[in-house]
């Protein structure tokens, strides 16, 4: 089973916020997920990001692939470097 770390959209029309989840790559964007590891709210100024870093690193070690957007967020927060050092 190939897993992805991706954003799941929630919120009202034109007021989105996103949950960062671990999901099977075959499931729908807002469908079934394995684990919730945080949330991201880009509408706040500055954008709010709350992640369980230990869980994200553990899933990266297990082979979960972040989507392009999540990859950019993880790079910006320095989590990918922490995961590389832990490996």
UniProtKB/Swiss-Prot annotation:
GO biological process, one term: translation
SUPFAM superfamilies, alphabetized: Ribosomal protein S16
PANTHER family noted in UniProt: 30S RIBOSOMAL PROTEIN S16, SMALL RIBOSOMAL SUBUNIT PROTEIN BS16M
Keywords, in A-Z order: Ribonucleoprotein, Ribosomal protein
Pfam families, sorted: Ribosomal_S16 (PF00886)
MF terms in GO: structural constituent of ribosome
An example Gene Ontology CC term for this record: cytoplasm
Family to which this protein belongs: Belongs to the bacterial ribosomal protein bS16 family.
Xref: HAMAP family: Ribosomal_bS16 (MF_00385)
NCBIfam families the record matches: S16
Protein's recorded name: Small ribosomal subunit protein bS16
């Amino acid at each position: 089973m190939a897993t992805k770390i991706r954003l799941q959209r929630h919120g009202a029309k034109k007021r989105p916020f996103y949950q960062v989840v671990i999901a099977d790559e075959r499931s729908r964007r807002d469908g079934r997920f394995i684990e919730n590891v945080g949330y991201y709210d880009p509408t706040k100024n500055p954008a709010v990001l709350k992640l369980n870093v230990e869980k994200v690193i553990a899933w990266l070690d297990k082979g979960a692939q972040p989507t392009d957007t999540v990859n950019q967020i993880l790079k910006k927060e320095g989590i990918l470097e922490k995961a590389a050092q832990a490996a």
